[in-house]
Every structure is written in C-alpha cells, then in structure tokens.
Design a protein with these regions (language model features):
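Phosphate-handling catalytic cores of nucleic-acid transaction enzymes
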Residues: 1-295
Length: 295
C-alpha cells in the first residue's frame, strides 16, 4: 500500500506545517506592529510574508508550482501518487509538463524558471526530487509512451502480478495495526531527519572490495542486457548502478538511526551493500519486463 509509504515521511511534512504556522504567527505580529507605526516612522520596512514549505508535492501541480515548491524547500521534494495517470495527464497538458525537470532532478542538474507574479528568475542548482507511483501497465504507457526519451531509465519498477486470492480482513486481532506500526516508524524517520539536519555534510563511500564487486556486476550486466535488448536499455542498466549506490546509502543511514552524531565519512557495511545489490538485481529484471511491454 502506497499510503503506508507516505506515513514514513508524514511526520516531516507535519513538522514543516508546524514551523510555517509559527512563522505566520510571528509575521502577523510584525505586520500589525508595522501598520500601527508606519505613519510615525517612514523608515520602517514592511515584514516579508513567509512562504509555506512542504516536503510532499501534489502531482497535479503546474510545472511552475512544482519548481516553486522545490525552491522554497531548498530544492528537495517528494511525490506520492496512487494513480499513475494523474501525473500522465499533467505531463500531457500545456501547463504541467515538467518531465524535463524529472530528468534533470535525477542527476541533481540545475533547473531554471521564471516566477510569473514578479518575473523573478530562479535557479534550482541541485534539485532532489523523488517520486513514488503506483498504476496499471496502461497508465505507465501513458506516462512514458516510449523508452527513448530518458524518463524511463530514471524510474525503477516493481511489477506486482495479480493473484485471485480473497484475504480475510477479520483474521487479525493484534492490537498494533499495520498503520500504527508505520506511524511509529515515521516518528523514527523524523528523528533521523532532525539529527541529519543538525550534522555537517556526510561523505558516503564503498570499500575497495565493494567497488570491485559493484563494477564487476554492472560491467557484466551491461553486456548481457545489450545482447538481449540492444542499445536503448543500456541507460537503464547504467542508471541502475547509481540507484543501487543510493539504496546502499539509505540502508547505511538507517543502520545508524540510533546515533546522535554522525562521522564525516561513512563506509558502507557489507550487509547493506549486499542487500542493495540483491534489490538491484530484482529491480533490473522488473525493469526489463516493463521495457519489453513498452517497446
């Protein structure tokens, strides 16, 4: 359930809302004081209204709005959408086609745009946008009509086969529901996020052995899939290498969830590296299946 995944970051979203509410209360007091005293002192400067920050970006937003939200959140954002055609419909519209922004954000490449209201030129130097979608094969085809424009290779896919099984929804009497469990994990994610925000920049590295295993696997995979599917699939293999590295990075940070201070240099634990590689090998098989259906 995609809604459960959202629970993992919902506490961070709520923290953003709380901080914005505090900023607005402070702004309203400053504005009231300004209105009372501006006639007495011509040198008074009007307070600037704070802009809301949000981690989770609505997928049906216009391109300009998506970039604006990213800009106001230091270039970071997430999207959760249970219907893949929501994003596909936005991409097919005149106002909402930000698929180029998706492609750039994957590699943290700069995105620039103009604010309509004040004609301000804005640059997102290192955008970081992650998206989680669920949908049917037809919805994927409407979102990514071809596999050559670069958007396909920037997604990872997990294909869930249909099973004709009726689940007994009354079968569990456990006090802790799965929603409650994910709520608890979400609070732990918030704590980890807060600790990371308070630490200096952290460098993540693989060991020499891990690098050798990584290069050996993807070198072989590149030739295997090239012989199997041709040139167009190579971008997916190569970007899967970067995705695998990022998965290993996330797993390494989750291992340190109870730490209060983080070292400036973190080496990947062997278990986390092996898990990332296993996940990657499964994902590339699913990516191959989706690629074959779209081609």
């Amino acid at each position: 359930r995609l809604t459960l995944c959202r629970k993992l970051v919902q506490p961070i979203q709520e923290q953003f809302r709380f901080l914005y509410k505090e900023d607005m209360e402070k702004f309203n007091k400053q504005k009231a004081a300004y209105e009372r005293n501006k006639k007495k002192d011509a040198n008074l400067i009007a307070p600037k209204q704070p802009r809301p920050k949000m981690l989770i970006i609505p997928a049906n937003s216009s391109a300009t709005m998506v970039y604006q939200i990213l800009s106001e959140n230091d270039g970071r954002g997430l999207m959760f959408e249970t219907e893949g055609d929501t994003l596909a419909n936005v991409f097919s519209s005149d106002y909402g086609n930000y698929s180029d922004g998706f492609r750039k954000a994957f590699h943290h490449e700069p995105i620039s745009y103009m604010r309509r209201k004040d004609h301000e030129y804005v640059e997102l130097l290192e955008p970081k946008l992650s998206t989680v979608l669920s949908g049917t094969p037809r919805q994927i085809a409407s979102l990514i009509p071809d596999t050559e424009n670069g958007l396909f290779s920037r997604f990872i896919f997990y294909y869930v086969d249909f099973k004709l099984t009726w689940l007994n929804v009354f079968g569990s009497n456990k006090e802790d529901s799965i929603d409650g469990i994910f709520d608890t994990i979400g609070k732990q994610v918030l704590e980890l996020y807060q600790h990371l925000q308070g630490n200096p920049q952290i460098r993540f590295c693989l060991t020499s052995r891990q690098k050798d295993l990584f290069n050996c696997y993807f070198r072989t995979a590149q030739h295997t899939y090239h012989d199997k599917l041709g040139d167009d699939f190579i971008a997916s293999v190569r970007r899967m290498g970067l995705i695998t590295y990022r998965i290993a990075m996330v797993l390494s940070m989750l291992r340190m969830v109870d730490e209060k201070d983080f070292p400036e240099l973190i080496y990947c634990h062997d278990e986390d590296f092996e898990c990332a590689m296993i996940i990657s090998k499964v994902l590339i098989q699913h990516t191959e299946r989706v690629y074959t259906e779209l081609s």
